[in-house]
Amino acid sequence: YVPVKSYAAAVSAFRNGQVQLAWFGALSGVQARSTVPNSQALAQGVEDQAFWTYLIAHKSTGLKVGDVIDKNMRGMTMTFGSKSSTSGRLIPEFYLTERFGESPDKVFERVGYSGNHSRTLRLVESGSYDVGAINYAVWERELAAGNIDTNAVKVIWKTPAYPNYQWSIRGDVDAQFGAGFSDKVKVALLAMDDPKLLKSFARSAFIPAQNSDYAPIKRTAQQVGLID
């Protein structure tokens, strides 16, 4: 087991062979698999089949809740999460660019990267930023725990669903550990039913995944210039 502190560090560890199996977000998984030929997505959480990002806004903005992104946010300040985050950057950047016809750095007065979803929430809640992009699961968890001042910050828009986290394995593991090793790892992941283990991932179970599930993520990343 090799702990890492960021998506970028996880991708580097996978590329350099420090780890053969890793738990990635959708974007970091695409990035990592592209560095090692024949690498495969093996499994995803049941909850990862459909993930969402929320755009949240401080009350002072007067931005409206709607089915489309409120164009009145032009000229405001915006914070994403980690630069390599699927839910905290890639997906919201894609839809903001689609809505405004230009990249966020041209839409907003200032664009920041908080580093994580909890920090994004606090920055918008405090008014340090007008608007933020946050993983829906983090918002819902904090809301249920009573940790959000809903008089200060609210959800104004929800993205369409997209696939997110997954287990990915290097393409050279069968050569390194023996024929069929990758399949055995996949079977073990899908059979995981220990409540404590699943709770550590905030997942109810793992189900099969494959690279093609993340083709839309790859295309989106290419369109916004995050990968070649």
Description of each model-found segment:
Residues Y1-G66, Y136:
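Short, glycine-/small- and polar/acidic-enriched structural segments
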Residues T77-E98, D183-D228:
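Ligand-binding clefts/hinges and TM-proximal coupling segments of bilobed small-molecule sensing domains
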Residues G45-Y54, N147-L189, K199-P216:
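Periplasmic-binding protein-like
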